[in-house]
């Protein structure tokens, strides 16, 4: 009977990404795993799925399969010669011939669990001053029923029926050399050489279960947007007794209504009147912890910037504080009473300025236009 197309076996199209292929394999292997599915033909289906994934998950093998299919090249290398072929799969083939397989990772060796990531949104104040927050996160934890063993309590393990305890299986592969036989880790026992007499009813043999876990996170004083902290050992459980992975909490900081932040420095925009700019003044302004009085010298112009040293954010690594910069904007009045206008005209005359007064009122401008003023 002819072999089915590997893409068809996994139920994905030929342009599927590696993640899509992996997701399809996990779903199907779980469905047809001999320890879970006792229906006739499930074992063969599981082998077919494993073989398809073994090829499509490897870039070189997938490229060879896409080019030659199941049969591989016939009658040598054809008109392309050696220069026109992709020999990316040779390393895998030769390693199986000359002992390269011994360098493969031991499937029974302890392995660290996967690292996880969690995004936490915090306020500007929480980032500046630091705080403690509780989060809820769904993650894999060690199964409480089997304690991570994967077997039903009270049952034992037996020799894997798929690899007969070898931990590895022989698989035929299509390559540019034709069909070659190589070894791979047994997909059923994952190299242990044993299988469950009866899998754990809670985790179905995985050794882990998905639960919502509450954790307390310390937000460091001075943390900035996109920075992260590591919670050691709060990731996924390890494999074969390996350590847990870590949890990385990434911070998203909401903007402040008062300040703008750039690293450890903060900026405050201060509007002052024409009189304050011309005569100078003392103005109370906010800082991160309290209000302070800022002296505005006479003749201050728009764009003037004042620096308040060490009034910025504390550096998250403990390297001092940033600065507070105050940006000045002189605001021109939009409405003047008659007395204010008289004073400004007098001021202009003293300066020798010939002012052609303009009105912001449409009716006044219209009257002046028709009078020819």
From Swiss-Prot:
Cofactor binding annotation: Binds 2 Zn(2+) ions per monomer.
Domain J: 5-69
Subcellular location, record wording: Cytoplasm
GO MF: ATP binding; heat shock protein binding; unfolded protein binding; zinc ion binding
Residue positions binding Zn(2+) 1: 143, 146, 200, 203
GO CC aspect terms: cytoplasm
List of residues binding Zn(2+) 2: 160, 163, 186, 189
Sorted UniProt keywords: Chaperone, Cytoplasm, DNA replication, Metal-binding, Repeat, Stress response, Zinc, Zinc-finger
Cofactor(s) in the UniProt record: Zn(2+)
Repeat positions for CXXCXGXG motif: 143-150, 160-167, 186-193, 200-207
SUPFAM superfamilies: Chaperone J-domain (SSF46565), DnaJ/Hsp40 cysteine-rich domain (SSF57938), HSP40/DnaJ peptide-binding domain (SSF49493)
Domain of life: Bacteria
Quaternary state and interactors: Homodimer.
Role summary: Participates actively in the response to hyperosmotic and heat shock by preventing the aggregation of stress-denatured proteins and by disaggregating proteins, also in an autonomous, DnaK-independent fashion. Unfolded proteins bind initially to DnaJ; upon interaction with the DnaJ-bound protein, DnaK hydrolyzes its bound ATP, resulting in the formation of a stable complex. GrpE releases ADP from DnaK; ATP binding to DnaK triggers the release of the substrate protein, thus completing the reaction cycle.
Protein name: Chaperone protein DnaJ
Taxonomy of the source species: Bacteria, Bacillati, Bacillota, Bacilli, Bacillales
């Amino acid at each position: 009977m002819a072999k089915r197309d590997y893409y068809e076996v996994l139920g994905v199209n030929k342009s599927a990404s590696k993640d899509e292929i992996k997701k399809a394999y996990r779903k199907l292997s779980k469905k047809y795993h001999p320890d879970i599915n006792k229906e006739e033909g499930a074992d063969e289906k599981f082998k077919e799925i494993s073989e398809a994934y073994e090829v499509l998950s490897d870039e070189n093998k997938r490229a060879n399969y896409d080019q030659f299919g199941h049969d591989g090249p016939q009658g040598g290398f054809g008109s392309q010669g050696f220069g026109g072929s992709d020999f990316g799969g040779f390393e895998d083939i030769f390693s199986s011939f000359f002992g390269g397989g011994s360098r493969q990772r031991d499937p029974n060796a302890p392995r660290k669990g996967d690292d996880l990531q969690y995004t936490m949104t915090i306020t500007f104040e929480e980032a500046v001053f630091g705080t403690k927050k509780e989060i809820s996160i769904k993650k894999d934890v060690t199964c409480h029923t089997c304690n991570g063993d994967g077997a039903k309590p009270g049952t034992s393990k037996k020799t894997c029926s798929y690899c007969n305890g070898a931990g590895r299986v022989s698989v035929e592969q299509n390559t540019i050399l034709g069909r070659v036989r190589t070894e791979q880790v047994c997909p059923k026992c994952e190299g242990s050489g044993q299988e469950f007499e009866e899998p754990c009813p809670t985790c179905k043999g995985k050794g882990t279960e998905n639960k919502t876990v509450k954790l307390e996170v310390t937000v460091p004083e001075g943390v900035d947007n996109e920075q992260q902290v590591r919670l050691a050992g709060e990731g996924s459980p390890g494999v074969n007794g390996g350590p847990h992975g870590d949890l990385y909490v990434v911070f998203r900081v909401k903007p402040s209504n008062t300040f703008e932040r750039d690293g450890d420095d903060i900026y405050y925009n201060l509007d002052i009147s024409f009189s304050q700019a011309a005569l100078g003044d003392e103005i109370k302004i906010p800082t991160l912890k309290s209000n302070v009085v800022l002296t505005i010298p006479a003749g201050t112009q728009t764009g003037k910037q004042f620096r308040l040293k060490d009034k910025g954010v504390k550096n998250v690594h403990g390297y001092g504080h940033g600065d507070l910069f105050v940006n000045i904007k002189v605001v021109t009045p939009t409405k003047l009473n008659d007395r204010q206008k008289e004073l400004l005209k007098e001021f202009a005359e003293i300066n020798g300025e010939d002012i052609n007064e303009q009105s912001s009122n449409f009716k006044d401008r219209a009257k002046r236009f028709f009078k020819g003023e």
